């Protein structure tokens, strides 16, 4: 660095530091500002002319150019700028001379110091070079000794490593036997490090050792995986899952450990398990473990002590040893770089292991209780409501399902713990976690659903319903027709044949054969045919311990609910969006699968218990009435269902609607029975007079009012009855025997009526209306709500010797109903009441048809009413009528209550009055002997009616007696009766008949005299008195018509006034 040395001329500048005044500092700054302004001017005004690349010669030539393109015109400006810059530079130098001198002095000092350092460095370099030359003097013997030493040292290291390597496999075997997996992992790691040593890698004799280490690593991995599965799925006794989950529950449900002295105590404790509390206790261990890991994330510790094996943060709860042990094993697997493989294996084996939990639990029951299970095969035929709680097999099954669901619960808790450990051991930045918990969760729910299907879905119900689905609102509808697929399958074993031929059976046999050859394989309608390989994770369906039934839910519900509640928050928050929760799964299954099975079961039980029986089979009721056995069968079934579903204490809308649908089904069954019994309602297809009367709306309204106690409509009823048969007294125009019910049909209708009355005696009393506050929001799902919604009780042990016991003697059975359900229940009750009304009305019509038939026959068969000799004999038709009435009354008395019996006979005397009066039109000639005969028959008939009636004083046939008595009197007496209104229900035509019969004998004699004269048949007989009386009746008819019109107008005005007044109010 000699070039830094300055020339030695004159004196050296001294270094001095003087402080500047404010004025000096301002002057220095001002000079610099002026110079800066000059430079800025150059940059702005001369930037295109003056630049770093400007050629001075070219610039000088441009200033000499006076043309318009030259710079001659700016030459003066350039000189002025030059002078100005020079002046300003001089000012800067003058103002900054002291600072400049100081800087120059400093520079001199620095150059001097650098030169001294260079001299010292050069001396040091020379010394080092001389020392190096002395050290590197050739020493041949020393180099040889050094080389040999290095060679022998390396050889000794290799031998030590080989000796250590040869001992590692044996140490690994010993530690594997002791299950000291952490030490095994350390030894393997050391062995692979030694094998990767360059000095050992080329040794051929050590290659088997390397292979042995790889096999031991694989063995270690398999042992770790197996122990993880043993812990998760409770295969070994190392981790007692009953202590890890909840020791209290197993004390309650376990028969061998509960210590109960009686079955009642055991059942009481089973029923009163607090699911919410136990679920919190069970989840406490997992929550504590997850909390500990979140607090100690990244602080991974390993302890080989079996009591506190903790790969991650050691939990304070010793009951977490299962989770800790799994964590330790996973950490060991992670240390051998096989954690992703382990996660895949755990995920793929999950379905099989979950299925094995169920299989092993059920097989344990089969091996322990084979005789009880044999008895269970006949259970379905003996009891359609599942195992009774008193049955020891029911208790065994409860324990079995508790064990299954608790093991499944512990398994999924372990999987959740693995998920948390995976985030610590193998964190990932992607959205997909390393451990596929959601996939395992889905497999677990699938297995639970298959378990429920195995014990709940009865194949007989599915086949018996033939695919028809009845919605909850009550109406039975067929399943909706699905649209045809756009891309139908090319081939399917069961659908390649159009008809149900024998070839189709062969197709099913082929499917069965494939299933036998390949266990677990089933030909599915949605099989993937893109590959010849079967990709199926399903298992061959296991035989259930007891016949499947919806009532098996009694032993499944509580453990299922505990599992559901305990796993309600087990799905990690990052997976909840696309994963179904346990509570949602439970609710969906119960509503979409289990509830339809309940409805199908009810329909099946109704078919088996009611519909399949002879509808006309009889049984004695508690009132000794013969009623249909189907009514008693339905009551027994209905009582059992109400008791099983606990309708007296809990209102469950969907269950209630299923029960109401069943009740409506029973009503429709009886309605169909009624229609088939009475016959078609089409008047064109049946000539029965009763059918015609049933179709008469006005008449049916009158019957309704009469049965409700209105006794003012008997005359109007009679008018409507005879509208269909106005000429009943004429041969060929009246009723025949075919219009009446035969004895068998009559007895059946009586029994039907008694059955409906018996049903209405107990059914309406079951209803108990309640007020339900509607909640605007959907209530949150929890175990307590779900338990109250789906809990079953036990079926009733009804006394078959007296199955029609009253509800009071059967535990005060009720069915709680809200407003909507009450209306549906009332509609069914109204249907039965309508059925009762029709049956009672039919009995009324039948007995009236009998009276009309016999009275009509009485007039048709009596040809002479003007006999010469009087007779007191009773007409055979009237005698037959009285005999039939007495026999019918006896049957009614035996079958129906007194009220209904009386309602059938009430008003019958009015109908007879009407028939006897209208039948007078068939009498041509009537004398006093004929009148006596008629009055004799009417009097006997009236006496018979009074004997049949509970209120004899109300039986009045005086109208008929007066009618025929007047036939034997004068016209003056007739008009006197009319004046006194003693013939209120006789029409003008009836009065004309009286007049005709009063003069009939005289007219008959006149006709006889004319027949003997020459004017035979030319002149009709006439009577002045008769003609005047007829004219007087005609005038009276006109006056009555006017009076009747006035009366109708008055009534109409009164109604309009009443309506107007009501509207004003």
From Swiss-Prot:
Q: Which residues form a coiled coil?
A: 114-148
Q: Where is the composition biased (Polar residues)?
A: 1009-1021
Which stretches are tagged as biased composition: Basic and acidic residues? Answer: 1025-1046
Give the record's membrane topology: Peripheral membrane protein
- Write out the GO biological process terms: endoplasmic reticulum inheritance; exocytosis; Golgi inheritance; Golgi to plasma membrane transport; protein transport; vesicle docking involved in exocytosis; vesicle tethering involved in exocytosis
The record's annotation in Pfam families points to: Sec8_C, Sec8_N
Q: Where does this protein reside within or beyond the cell?
A: Cytoplasm; Cell membrane
Fetch the InterPro entries from UniProt: Sec8/EXOC4, Sec8_exocyst_N, Sec8_M
Phosphoserine found at: 16, 19
Its domain of life reads: Eukaryota
Keywords of this protein's UniProt record, alphabetized?
A: Cell membrane, Coiled coil, Cytoplasm, Exocytosis, Membrane, Phosphoprotein, Protein transport, Transport
Q: What is its main location?
A: cytoplasm
Oligomeric state and interaction partners are given as: The exocyst complex is composed of SEC3, SEC5, SEC6, SEC8, SEC10, SEC15, EXO70 and EXO84.
| PANTHER family xrefs | EXOCYST COMPLEX COMPONENT 4
In which family does this protein belong, per the annotation?
Answer: Belongs to the SEC8 family.
Q: What is this protein called?
A: Exocyst complex component SEC8
> What lineage is this protein's organism placed in?
Eukaryota, Fungi, Dikarya, Ascomycota, Saccharomycotina
